Design a protein with these regions (language model features):
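Active-site neighborhoods and metal-handling regions in enzymes and metal-associated proteins
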Residues: 1-418
Length: 418
């Protein structure tokens, strides 16, 4: 299926339940990589003017192009073309869409998909064009995993669990030998494992010792960071995907791999502090409740949104007395990007009211962050065709990492061999 065919399929699905006349794509001066990705346009193509591509649910797409750059959409279907060189000419062309409803990469609650600039939105509204969010369309187009995507994510997740085990063994070796170990050394070890297993990532993993674990997106400094001390909480957050994968039809492509993203918690010592055990127990309860809630809703045919699941998880943490320790949403959509275009488990930061659908994939990563230390436990879930949740990579090694279960239920110590 071509990108145009897929856009029209999802537009038809949406137009069947709403008054949608088309999906409008636009870019100015090459700024919008999401739009270029969706339309399979080169990311490095040089443009300095605005182009517009309107795809109706059925029929031919329309191109609106600047006279200086008439060929920027030559790779896309659509024989109907309009050209402009002034804003007045652009307005006259757009006026034919007066009273039409067009979807845009814009949403008042989801800045991650809002790539269309406010000035252009105002221009459309001045011409009497009704705009609506393309959030649901984007979810259907890019945020739903195919069978090949899911298998790739499963393989990546299994490798990440193995890497967590190897990394913890590396940490334990330093503990037992009393050789100093800093955060950067652990980070480098993880990146070496990514290379070894032919995985790729968009950023170095989070490795945080002690109080640094209270910063959810802690960055290890180039000088090596903190040296592990007895009793330090260690937070590991790693994400990666395969470099290439099979599309189930014998074609190997970099477009097929889907990310996996997991987080584990350990302590640099042989015993776990009581408060750490208490916090981690709350997090595990909150994390596990997501799959339970999805299963119960699916069995009753009740739709669930990402916002509902996030608020459900938050209520568990708040009830345990740690509401003020929450710093982020419960999870994010996952596809070919680690922060993908599908539904996020978010009812607070950027409320996501899109439904959990078959093929949806997302992280579940509740966190509790104090000034003394922080922690989060993270798994990935995808939804099968019956609406049931599956934990990616759980089948790795029969759901075991040493004596620990997948998902993690107890904090690691240096007595563990994984």
């Amino acid at each position: 299926m071509t990108c145009l065919e897929k856009i029209q399929v999802v537009s038809q699905q949406e137009s069947a339940v709403s008054a949608l006349d088309g999906w409008l794509f636009t870019d100015f001066a090459g700024r919008d990589n999401l739009t270029k990705d969706l339309l399979q346009l080169p990311l490095d193509g040089m443009t300095t003017r605005r182009w517009i591509y309107i795809v109706p649910p059925t029929g031919e797409p329309v191109k609106i192009l600047h006279k200086m750059e008439p060929h920027v959409l030559v790779s896309l279907p659509g024989a109907k073309e309009f050209f402009y060189s002034s804003q007045q000419e652009l307005k006259e062309i757009l006026s034919q869409y007066k009273d039409k409803t067009l979807a845009l990469l814009w949403d008042q609650d989801l800045p991650v998909i809002s790539t269309v600039d406010g000035g252009f939105i105002s221009l459309l509204q001045q011409e009497g064009i009704k705009i609506t969010s393309a959030a649901k369309l984007l979810q259907l187009y890019k945020g739903i995993l195919s069978a090949a995507n899911i298998q790739s994510q499963e393989r990546a997740a299994a490798l990440l669990y193995k890497i967590i085990g190897d990394t913890w063994n590396f940490i334990c070796q330093h503990y037992k030998s009393k050789e100093p170990l800093n955060e950067r050394a652990v980070q480098i070890f993880i990146l070496e494992q990514f290379y070894k297993y032919k995985l790729t990532t968009n950023h170095s993993p989070v490795v945080a010792f002690g109080a640094h674990s209270g910063d959810p997106h802690y960055e290890v400094p180039e000088n090596g960071g903190k040296i592990a001390e007895e009793g330090d909480i260690i937070q590991l957050d790693i994400w990666a995907k395969e470099r290439l994968a099979d599309d189930d039809q014998g074609n190997i492509s970099a477009a097929i791999p889907a990310y996996a993203d997991i987080s584990w918690v350990g302590v640099f010592g042989q015993t776990v502090p009581e408060e750490a055990e208490k916090r981690f127990s709350v997090l595990c309860q909150a994390r596990n409740s997501v799959a339970t809630a999805i299963t119960e809703a699916a069995s009753k045919g009740i739709p669930l949104t990402g916002a509902q699941l996030d608020l459900h998880v938050r209520s568990i943490i708040e009830k345990a007395g740690y509401g003020s320790y929450i710093k982020h949403r419960t999870g994010h959509g996952i596809d070919s990007e680690v922060h993908g275009s599908g539904v996020n488990l978010d009812g607070s930061e950027f409320p996501d009211y899109r439904e959990i659908l078959p093929g949806s994939s997302f992280s579940v990563e509740p966190g509790i962050y104090g000034e003394d230390f922080g922690m989060r436990t993270e798994i990935d879930i995808y939804i099968d065709q019956t609406g049931m949740p599956i934990v990616s990579g759980k089948k790795f090694n029969q759901g075991k990492l040493g004596e620990h279960s997948i998902p993690q239920q107890k904090i690691l110590t240096t007595k563990d061999v994984l």
